[in-house]
UniProtKB/Swiss-Prot annotation:
The gene is argF. It catalyses: carbamoyl phosphate + L-ornithine = L-citrulline + phosphate + H(+). It comes from Shewanella oneidensis (strain ATCC 700550 / JCM 31522 / CIP 106686 / LMG 19005 / NCIMB 14063 / MR-1). Its main location: cytoplasm. GO terms for cellular component: cytoplasm. HAMAP family: OTCase. This is Ornithine carbamoyltransferase.
């Protein structure tokens, strides 16, 4: 594994190995306290971040590495100088680049023109670190990850894409339930279905909220993605039937609730579900660090 740009680029064994390593790191962190000794990692963020930035920074430091944060929120990469020049210069000093960008093309250019590993910390198309942490979380509750039946409810976005790739490659079942016009991009769905066919996964997309029945976990995200100027009032009525509340959890028979955060409480999910016994949101947040450290250890090994 040279970079970590998208889940779809991994084999089933590579994905399972990352989950296994993340479990080991979480259980025995002291054994890895020197795993990143002497390594310097640059973080380039065009978008705001809490969990991604803090989990990378603290995780890298816990393992003996050094993290440098470059705030790009006042302008996209490539405006002041080309992404190619940016990547090649950073590669002279840094051992890896972690990037959160508006365009996935920027991530790909960093990997193409740099000479060090690049990790996608979120782009418009994918959020692989989040999905890896989420399936690590599920793997802590299911002996066989392929037995998982996950339902995603709401707006099809970058998180949805990465979750679908994970489910397909791991041979799990995932139902994506979105209002009409808010499904993941067709070419992503086609890639996911090809991977599901290869690895034994089952991915279903529908607008029918009744399809929620018979799932182990319900996952949702904000109805409007970061940077989308659409007013919430314009879509609230359309999305209202897809709110995750106690009634929907009961209808699904779900034991777990998941959200990548930040959440709009009372909008896509109620407080009762967010703070309830079924909620895995803090476990997901903690697992971001362990999953990302597994990626870093793998890239540097």
């Amino acid at each position: 594994m040279k970079h970590f740009l998208s889940i779809k680029e991994l084999t089933q064994q590579q994905l399972l190995d990352l989950i296994t390593l993340a479990k080991t790191i979480k259980a025995n962190p002291a054994e890895y306290r020197h795993a990143l000794d002497g390594k310097s990692v640059v973080m380039l963020f065009e978008k705001p971040s809490l969990r991604t930035r803090v989990s990378f920074d603290i995780g890298i430091n816990k393992f003996g590495g050094h993290c440098l944060y470059l705030d790009q929120q006042n302008g996209a990469l490539g405006k002041r100088e080309s992404v190619a020049d940016f990547a090649s210069n950073l590669s002279c000093w840094a051992d890896a680049i972690v990037a959160r960008t508006y365009s996935h093309t920027t991530i790909e250019q960093l990997a193409e023109f740099g000479t060090v590993p690049v990790i996608n910390a979120l782009s418009d198309l994918y959020h692989p670190c989040q999905a890896l942490a989420d399936f690590l979380t599920l793997a802590e509750h299911f002996e066989n990850i392929s037995d998982v039946k996950l339902a995603y409810v709401g707006d099809g976005n970058n998180v949805t894409n990465s979750l679908m790739y994970c489910a397909a490659i791991l041979g799990a079942t995932m139902t994506v339930i979105c209002p009409a016009g808010h499904f993941p991009d067709g070419y992503v769905v086609a890639e996911v279905q090809e991977l599901a066919s290869r690895y034994g996964g089952k991915i279903v997309l529908t607008s029918d909220i009744d399809a929620i029945e018979g799932h182990d976990a319900i996952y949702t995200d904000t109805w409007i993605s970061m940077g989308d100027p659409t007013p919430l009032a314009e879509i609230k009525d359309k999305f209202a039937p897809y709110q995750v509340n106690n009634a929907l959890m009961a209808k699904a028979g779900a034991h777990f609730f998941m959200h990548c955060l930040p959440a709009h409480r009372g909008v896509e999910v109620t407080d009762a579900v967010m703070d309830g016994e079924c909620s895995l949101i803090l476990q997901q947040a903690e697992n971001r660090m362990h999953a990302q450290n597994a990626v870093l250890v793998t890239l540097f090994s």
